[in-house]
Amino acid sequence: MFAIIETGGKQIKVEEGQEIYVEKLDVNEGDAFTFDKVLFVGGDAVKVGAPTVEGATVSATVNKQGRGKKITVFTYRRRKDSKRKKGHRQPYTKLTIDKINA
């Protein structure tokens, strides 16, 4: 059985036991988290939401709060001796999918 959930403005296909990385959620490590925005449930019985599946939830456990790899943002204006260098690390949350309730 699998489901498609929406979190952080993205749609993610998940299965039970899978580890996923999502945009940062405001929860502590080791806590349980429930996704209510389930768009699709597949498997033996297919359920398609309009826009979400009524009564369907996905339960997950928070493994880690972290930050991604650093990217460098470099901007310059030619012939003007003007340049700017910045770095950015995107925060993320690592989850393990425990159960899909449909």
UniProtKB/Swiss-Prot annotation:
Single GO cellular component term: ribosome
Superkingdom assignment: Bacteria
Assigned keywords, A-Z: Ribonucleoprotein, Ribosomal protein, RNA-binding, rRNA-binding
Feature: compositional bias, Basic residues: 79-91
Region (Disordered): 79-102
Biological process terms in GO annotation: translation
GO molecular function: rRNA binding; structural constituent of ribosome
Signal peptide location: none
Subunit structure: Part of the 50S ribosomal subunit. Contacts protein L20.
PANTHER family cross-referenced by the UniProt entry: 50S RIBOSOMAL PROTEIN L21 (PTHR21349), LARGE RIBOSOMAL SUBUNIT PROTEIN BL21M (PTHR21349:SF0)
Similarity comment: family membership: Belongs to the bacterial ribosomal protein bL21 family.
Function: This protein binds to 23S rRNA in the presence of protein L20.
Protein name as annotated: Large ribosomal subunit protein bL21
Gene source species: Staphylococcus carnosus (strain TM300)
